[in-house]
Amino acid sequence: MRKIIIAGNWKMYKTQAEALEFVQVFKSKIEDTDESREIVLCAPFTDLGAMSKNLHGSRIKLGAQNVHWEEAGAYTGEISGAMLTEIGVSYVIVGHSERRQYFGDTDETVNLRVLAAQKYGLIPILCVGESKSQRDAGETEKIIINQLKRDLVDVDQNKLVIAYEPIWAIGTGDTCESSEANRVIGIIREQLTNKNVSIQYGGSVKPGNIDEIMKQSEIDGALVGGASLNPADFAQIVNYK
């Protein structure tokens, strides 16, 4: 049985005070949300400790946005899996296109991060997707299959979430047609040994398109960027019909 997982990726937004204010408002808007839907908030590192205390006993799971592959060491500015699990983090985004584009993540380092996350009991949300030029060149399928091949070496697919995020649709307002997202996610599923991995769509998800996205047979949730910053908008997404 594939689990529905809706995750908000706050990126580099929200101070601790803003995060706690969000949680207070958001909690009140999801009291009647279908219990089978997993709700995750992936917040900046500085928010996680305070949010963990605030979310204790609630149905909302806490997620981080990155994790280093080493347990400890002279890696200035990095955070390990052990540090995240200690403060109650359950999920971690790995391989987001912004990490690949701006911070030099490769399929090899993404694979190390996924393995480290699993080692410390975190569920990685592995992001894969093609750029505009790759899509225009008809390379979508090839690019994604290659990413998966490299990113999933030795990975336990029973403790994994995948997010298909077409890079050209992130933060641009351009949403991939839901039928096309469904087709690509079907291709992703074909590459997996565990066909029950939850696969999300990410890329300009908002209250106005979530119903259509979630009607698709292959799509098991969403990785939501900008629209997750507003508690009313994110609640609408979580409460899709």
From Swiss-Prot:
Organism from which the protein derives: Gloeothece citriformis (strain PCC 7424) (Cyanothece sp. (strain PCC 7424))
GO cellular component, as recorded: cytosol
Catalytic residues identified in the record: 96 (electrophile), 165 (proton acceptor)
Family matches, as CDD domains: TIM
Disulfide bonds: none
Keyword ATP-binding among record annotations: no
Protein name per Swiss-Prot or TrEMBL: Triosephosphate isomerase
Record PROSITE patterns: TIM_1 (PS00171), TIM_2 (PS51440)
EC number: 5.3.1.1
Protein family: Belongs to the triosephosphate isomerase family.
Location(s), subcellular: Cytoplasm
InterPro entries in UniProt: Aldolase_TIM (IPR013785), TIM_sf (IPR035990), TrioseP_Isoase_bac/euk (IPR022896), Triosephosphate_isomerase (IPR000652), Triosephosphate_isomerase_AS (IPR020861)
Enzyme class: isomerase
Catalytic activity: D-glyceraldehyde 3-phosphate = dihydroxyacetone phosphate
Gene Ontology terms describing biological process: gluconeogenesis; glyceraldehyde-3-phosphate biosynthetic process; glycerol catabolic process; glycolytic process
The UniProt record lists the keyword Transport: no
GO molecular function: triose-phosphate isomerase activity
HAMAP family: TIM_B
Cited Pfam families: TIM
Chain's role: Involved in the gluconeogenesis. Catalyzes stereospecifically the conversion of dihydroxyacetone phosphate (DHAP) to D-glyceraldehyde-3-phosphate (G3P).
Residues at which substrate binds: 9-11, 171, 204, 225-226
